[in-house]
Amino acid sequence: MAKDLTNYRNFGIFAHVDAGKTTTTERILKLTGKIHKIGEVHEGAATTDFMEQEQERGITIQSAATSCFWKDHQLNIIDTPGHVDFTIEVYRSLKVLDGGVGVFCGSGGVEPQSETNWRYANDSKVARIIYVNKLDRTGADFYKVVKQVKDVLAAEPLVMVLPIGIENDFVGVVDLLTRKAWVWDDSGDPTKYEIKDVPENMTDDVEKYREMLVETAIEQDDEVMEKYLEGEEPDLDTLKRCIRKGTKDLVFFPTYCGSSFKNKGVQLVLDAVVDFLPNPTEIKPQPEIDLEGNETGKFAYVDPEKPLRALAFKIMDDKYGALTFTRIYSGTLSKGDTVLNTFTGKTERIGRLVEMHADSREEIESAQAGDIVAIVGMKNVQTGHTLCDPKEPATLEPMVFPDPVISIAVAAKDKGSVEKLGMALSKMVQEDPSFRVETDAESNETIIKGMGELHLDIKVDILKRTYGVDVEVGKPQVAYRESITKRLEDSYTHKKQSGGSGQFAKIDYMIEPGEVGTGFDFQSKVTGGNVPREFWPAVQKGFETSFEKGMLAGYPCVDMKFTLMDGAFHPVDSSAIAFEIAAKAAYRQSFSKAAPQLLEPIMKVDVFTPDDHVGDVIGDLNRRRGMIKSQDSAATGSRIKADVPLSEMFGYIGDLRTMTSGRGQFSMEFSHYAPCPANVAEVVIKEAKERQEAKSK
């Protein structure tokens, strides 16, 4: 029997590291009856933080999917990490969600990572509720955070509750819709609360904010607005309908507050998820694409009767085996079904289906459009692959992941672990598309690449803890790039005569800087038959293969354009291989003449510091060759945004803590590539040459 999809809510909880997402999820699970004893993050016992690395560090690394129920609605919750090195997890979960709860710290306000996550959610057009947490904290200020949401995120918070008391005196909230006060006792039991009349000293504020709430909400319905202007107050159901519409259309974001740790305020957030976040049928259907990645004009409609369309959005290995977390967009998926993976072109049989609750699971017979489930034991699937009905194949828009910016060499400490290391790394690549593994062709070293220092630290930790492989770790290496700055026309002739048939190929070509972001670009302007068309791909291949390695320090090249202008061939001695060799030699001949330059990755750095350390932090960023972009006051200090070369940011977290007595925070994400200053390029090139020499000995 088909489930009622209007009673589904697929949503994520996301925020800055330490804003209290995991604690909030724990409280939700307690209230919805999924767990009996609440696990505390600071004790390393939280239900959704189930990797050892997460429990030790107190940060959530993998998005754990959890299903629970509230007021006859099924909630599928994704708990996402807040640390910038794991932003990929946030992006990946937003891709498959219909709504979100953005958690902000009552004292920290809109912190760096909150901004990144908010931007991703805007890009994915995900409706959100705001929850200002930790109002029991010293320095907490609900109204200041609301103002920051407006100023920093350029978003419209719709205040739904007002706090009763603050810091140690925080006891509950006033629900503006009902004009009732929810007051919790200090027993630590979230169900021990009373609903009372509004405290006398708050009535004026309550009326003022309620009027603002009503006037903002009714703008969603002209008819209701007209009646209101004529003096008719909208009833509760009408108001909720208007708020739901505005939330769904991203016009505003219903804003709540509380203290998850003290078990105060979470029920109203759950009510808001049910009342205001969209169900799967209210979301724009996923477009289907062809093999070239172009939209076909068809859509995966949320309907259990339609052909199966599902997206694998996360692969995980746990103690039960390989899990493929899947969002079903249309159709129904049952045990025993055969599905087609459109990326590999292979079919697989579905052995077992499970509904996840953090790291425990419940076996189910089938799932349908709107569900988020895990498939056990799939072999050839990766994140972003589409699973569909083999009789009616279609591909959903895949996920796009950024290139890594940092790499380190790893080697097994003993020979017996070499094979184990290879198997472990291939599983880890399947699980995390922003993590890459390569083998250096010359040194045969295994190189792992990722999004930041912490990202790779955690991977090394996982190798040791989860797979039992001890590794030696090299020094972090920056992913430099090479390019040229000058346009050059040149010619090269490849001749080889050694008895029998020889080799001959002549090419006249132009090499020039390309537009930023174009990568490798090749075209032929040959007219007539001087270079027959059949040899053009060989010329392209020769240039493209060479392009993978620059001549300055051996780093990959970016943004270069190659044009085949003319040339000559011999009817007997010319071949595709001769033209490929000519192009490779031409590249080596011309690269150094075209004013090559080394490019370095520049990171967008966002630092929070208490005001009395601002001078030290700015001075330090300047010493790191940083360019300060802005400085603004935050809730409890200052926000400094800067562009800083990645090579200067190693170990920054330790230095920042020292400078700010442990109170500074920062986030960092890749921004762009920029030319290296000559003195820096000189050192990088020298070190690269020394490494090459050491490898060839």
UniProtKB/Swiss-Prot annotation:
GO terms for biological process: ribosome disassembly. It holds the Pfam family EFG_III. GO terms for cellular component: cytoplasm. Its main location: cytoplasm. The keyword Protein biosynthesis applies. Keywords: Cytoplasm, Elongation factor, GTP-binding, Nucleotide-binding, Protein biosynthesis. It is found in: Cytoplasm. Coiled coil: none annotated. One of its GO terms (molecular function) is translation elongation factor activity. Residues 6-281 form the tr-type G domain. GTP binds at residues 15-22, 79-83, 133-136. InterPro entries: EFG_II (IPR041095), EFG_III (IPR009022), EFG_III/V (IPR035647), EFG_IV (IPR047872), EFG_V (IPR035649), EFG_V-like (IPR000640), EFTu-like_2 (IPR004161), G_TR_CS (IPR031157). CDD domains: EF-G, EFG_III, EFG_mtEFG1_IV, EFG_mtEFG_C, EFG_mtEFG_II. It comes from the Bacteria. Catalyzes the GTP-dependent ribosomal translocation step during translation elongation. During this step, the ribosome changes from the pre-translocational (PRE) to the post-translocational (POST) state as the newly formed A-site-bound peptidyl-tRNA and P-site-bound deacylated tRNA move to the P and E sites, respectively. Catalyzes the coordinated movement of the two tRNA molecules, the mRNA and conformational changes in the ribosome. Belongs to the TRAFAC class translation factor GTPase superfamily. Classic translation factor GTPase family. EF-G/EF-2 subfamily. This is Elongation factor G 2. It comes from Trichodesmium erythraeum (strain IMS101).
